[in-house]
């Protein structure tokens, strides 16, 4: 299969293929232009994979440009976080990081050009009046009384705006297009507004800042972008994108193409709603493992490869749709099943004593991966007192229960066959200790007399156990579309985080943050980067061994 045949196909790539074949473009140049006012989420990952992936596949370039035109909401913290997320996902931008603020001088000059052409004017309507004059989807707007000012007056007033002669909200620069346009975005949109705020890149040089629609298209043109890719909500804005470039003196005119945004079940993508979750402390921060942010997914244990694979599978279309959470979980589950070393941890422990076991203990050999001998093996301590999971023992059970039952046998993973003889309980009737015997001739082999022992359970030697905190993360919301609820906070899943105190095999004391393990028979976990200590490691559940929500959706 050729390199071209191996590429994913979608309507954007078909457009690029046609542009290259016709000679319209000889190279491909894309960009990823986030606003640095929050943390990137899984929806941004789709755009990152699309823009950087196209540049990679067509041996072109992709710029990282920060759309930093609103200093009130932006911060250098977000700039650094976004750069880190892009690199973590496995992509590299072309040349230096770019900022829309790099072009503030040129943007100002282009605004003056529009004024000189009679295509922009300074308006002194209040923001509320501008909204009122704009009209509705069914009613045309009406002209501002300031719309027909002379070029000279507009130039003088725009300079007054630039030098701080107006208070915030008292004046703005608007394009002069058509207040009766069926597209509200074309009804004399605001191009510049006043903000007396220090900018993280330009300091206090400016007190007027360009709007997104004016900045975006000019920045694309100045950078030589060939294909400007954005989500469907900007479809109508393409008319303004083209209008600006058609009416200024600029040699390059990129084209904008829209694709559907990523909607994912059981979460929200709105920056406002995500911010509310953080500020109201429903989660512990933007990197909370339940958040759809890239930093949250990373802390939970998602790999960059699994997110890239997810973006590849969902594809690029023009139709909005909602992706099942199971699709994302299946990508990380497949990745970790293939690549994560195995380990044993008991999440809900109960003591098990092997009464006929002699000696202080021994080491048993365990493979790090059952299907990958190249991943090697490890030595795990075994002793006469172990921890097993409470769910792995019953005093009575039916034939479908393949774990330890009173009076019956089960195999301990990679160790011996044991038989439950009796139990000890506390005053409330809870089992505190299970007493067993073991068959000393069954270390990693079947009983000599040929009897069949079907069940296998995991365990941890009590004398060598590493105390661990286990954080069982689940979906943040209890309904597939929380954004549709009257109050999305009312459908937060109360069991989205369950904290357990358990025990793990001692090899896990060397675990590093972000490194994934399969806790045998439990799921995939990674060491938490925020709360773990040498004395008390904290492990986050990334995903279960199987989709436990499958029946919920049926």
UniProtKB/Swiss-Prot annotation:
GO terms for molecular function: ATP binding; glutamine-tRNA ligase activity. Residues 317-324 are annotated as: Interaction with tRNA. CDD domains: GlnRS_core. It is found in: Cytoplasm. GO terms for cellular component: cytosol. A motif ('KMSKS' region) lies at residues 268-272. PROSITE patterns: AA_TRNA_LIGASE_I (PS00178). One of its GO terms (biological process) is glutamyl-tRNA aminoacylation. ATP binds at residues 35-37, 41-47, 231, 261-262, 269-271. InterPro entries: aa-tRNA-synth_I_CS, Gln-tRNA-synth, Gln/Glu-tRNA_Ligase, Gln_tRNA_ligase_bac, Glu/Gln-tRNA-synth, Glu/Gln-tRNA-synth_Ib_cat-dom, Glu/Gln-tRNA-synth_Ib_codon-bd, Glu_tRNA_lig_a-bdl. A motif ('HIGH' region) lies at residues 34-44. Its EC number is 6.1.1.18. L-glutamine binds at residues 67, 212. Its main location: cytoplasm. Keywords: Aminoacyl-tRNA synthetase, ATP-binding, Cytoplasm, Ligase, Nucleotide-binding, Protein biosynthesis. It catalyses: tRNA(Gln) + L-glutamine + ATP = L-glutaminyl-tRNA(Gln) + AMP + diphosphate. Monomer. Belongs to the class-I aminoacyl-tRNA synthetase family. This is Glutamine--tRNA ligase.
């Amino acid at each position: 299969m050729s390199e071209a045949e191996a590429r994913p196909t979608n309507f954007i790539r078909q457009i690029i293929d046609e542009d290259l074949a016709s000679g319209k473009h000889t190279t491909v140049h894309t960009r990823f232009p986030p606003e640095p006012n929050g943390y990137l989420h899984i929806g941004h990952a789709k755009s990152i994979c699309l823009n950087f992936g196209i540049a990679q596949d067509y041996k072109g370039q992709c710029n990282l440009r920060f759309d930093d035109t609103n200093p009130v909401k932006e911060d250098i913290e977000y700039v650094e976080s976004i750069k880190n997320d892009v690199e973590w996902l496995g992509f590299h931008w072309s040349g230096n990081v770019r900022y829309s603020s790099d072009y503030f001088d040129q943007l100002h000059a282009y605004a003056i050009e529009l004024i000189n052409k009679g295509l922009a004017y300074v308006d002194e309507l209040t923001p509320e009046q501008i909204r009122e004059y704009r009209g509705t989807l069914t009613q045309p707007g009406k002209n501002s009384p300031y719309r027909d000012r002379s070029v000279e007056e507009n130039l003088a007033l725009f300079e007054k705006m630039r030098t701080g002669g107006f208070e915030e909200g008292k004046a703005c620069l608007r394009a002069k297009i058509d207040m009766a346009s069926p597209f509200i975005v074309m009804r004399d949109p605001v191009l510049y507004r006043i903000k007396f705020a220090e900018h993280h890149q330009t300091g206090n040089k400016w007190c007027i800042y360009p709007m997104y629609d004016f900045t975006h298209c000019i920045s694309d043109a100045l950078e030589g972008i060939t294909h400007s890719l954005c989500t469907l909500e900007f479809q109508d804005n393409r008319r303004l994108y083209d209008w600006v470039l058609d009416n200024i003196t600029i040699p390059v005119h990129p084209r904008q193409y829209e694709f559907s945004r990523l909607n994912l079940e059981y979460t929200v993508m709105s920056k406002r709603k995500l911010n509310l979750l953080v500020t109201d402390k429903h989660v512990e921060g933007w990197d909370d493992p339940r958040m759809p942010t890239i930093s949250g997914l990373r802390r939970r244990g998602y790999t960059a490869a699994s997110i890239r694979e997810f973006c590849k599978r969902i594809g690029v279309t023009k139709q909005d749709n909602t992706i099942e959470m199971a699709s994302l979980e299946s990508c990380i589950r497949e990745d970790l099943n293939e690549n994560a070393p195995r380990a044993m941890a008991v999440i809900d422990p109960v003591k098990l004593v092997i009464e006929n076991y002699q000696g202080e203990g021994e080491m048993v050999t365990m493979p790090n991966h059952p299907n990958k001998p190249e991943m090697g093996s490890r030595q795990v301590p075994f002793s006469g007192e172990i921890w097993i999971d409470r769910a792995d023992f019953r005093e009575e059970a039916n034939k479908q229960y393949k774990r330890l039952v009173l009076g019956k046998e089960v195999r301990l993973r990679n160790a011996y066959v044991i038989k439950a003889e009796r139990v000890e309980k506390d005053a409330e009737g809870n089992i505190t200790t299970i007493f067993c015997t073991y068959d000393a001739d069954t270390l990693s082999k079947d009983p000599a007399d040929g009897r069949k022992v079907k069940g296998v359970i995991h365990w941890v030697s009590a004398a060598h156990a590493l105390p661990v905190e286990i954080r069982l993360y689940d979906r943040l919301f209890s309904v597939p579309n929380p954004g549709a609820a009257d109050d999305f906070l009312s459908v937060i899943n109360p069991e989205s985080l369950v904290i357990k105190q358990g025990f793990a095999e001692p090899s896990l004391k060397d675990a590093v943050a972000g490194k994934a393990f399969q806790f045998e028979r439990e799921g995939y976990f990674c060491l938490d980067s925020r709360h773990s200590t040498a004395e008390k490691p904290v492990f986050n559940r990334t995903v279960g061994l199987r989709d436990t929500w499958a029946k919920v959706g049926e």
